[in-house]
Amino acid sequence: SSKGLFSKVIHQSGGSSLTNRSVREAHLALGHVFAQQTVGDDVDDPIRAMRQLPADTILEAADTVFKNHYFDAVVDGHSVRESIMDTLRDGKIHAVDLLIGSNDDEWLMYTGDQPDIEGWLDAEVARSSVDTLHAILADEIDDRRKLDLLRTAKYYVCPSLVLAQEVSNVGRRAWVYHFTRQREGDLAATMGAYHGAELPYVFDTHDDWLPTVEADHRLTKVMQSYWVNFATNGNPNQSGLQPWLPFKSDSRKIQSIGDRLYSSEHPSQPLCAFLSPT
């Protein structure tokens, strides 16, 4: 059990862990194929045999067998006994304070120039919800951005809000952020507030592949103050900082962190009525 091992949680762009779709049987089948390709079928202990192989052999086979496969936690009945959503439904999460959030464009840089919105909706959303989702996004004319909003909401925003609500329900404080800062320049414009964009601000590790201007340094100081305050006290607020309201079931306030700092409902909240994990 992990109970008592931590007193607070900072969870950045991690909402997808609530909705992982890894199936044990599928992993076992891939493992069998992997063993066949590396050591064959006529081996009593394939794992031991694979451990004797050169690393290059293992990597070459993995590139073939696990191509396009997404690794995630698998409910195996031993180390992982149930899905996170089952834990939430049963009210068994640890009562600790939570700081959680995601970025405005988590999926934009991974979206091609001809996004298949209808294909994604067919695969990911109940048919009865499709027309309403189209209506919610009717004002968005850029199809790449539209698919980015849908993916970011389903895989990051909506699960994060579900977890924040459950933390609030068990009597602890949840603080939700929405990171919106886009760097200056043409390259940054193609990515927006991309997956991982908040990390240089949290750790003050700005690299030179994107421009860093005075506004970025100011935001770094603000975010580091929020994060350190939370790690210390379970509350990101302090005198002199823009107030950050806790997330609650009745108010659902999040903190927008970017060129402006302010509290509001998450702009993707309407999408979450149809895209939240259940």
Where are the predicted features?
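Structural motif
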Residues: S1, L88-G91, Y194, R218
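Substrate-access "cap/lid" subdomains that shape
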Residues: K3, K8, Q12-L121, K146-N169
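Short acidic (Asp/Glu) and glycine-rich catalytic loops that position anionic groups and cofactors
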Residues: K8-H11, G31, D41-D42, D139-D143, ...
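Short coil/turn segments at secondary-structure junctions
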Residues: L18, D142-D148, L210-E214
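Alpha-helix N-cap/helix-start motif at coil-to-helix transitions, marked by capping-box chemistry
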Residues: E25, E124-R127, D131, A193, ...
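C-terminal, loop-rich substrate-recognition/catalytic regions characterized by aromatic stacking residues
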Residues: I93-L137, R183, Q224, S256-T278
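Alpha/beta-hydrolase fold catalytic core
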Residues: R127-V170, W175-R181
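Mobile gating loops/cap/lid regions near enzyme active sites that modulate substrate access
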Residues: C158-T278
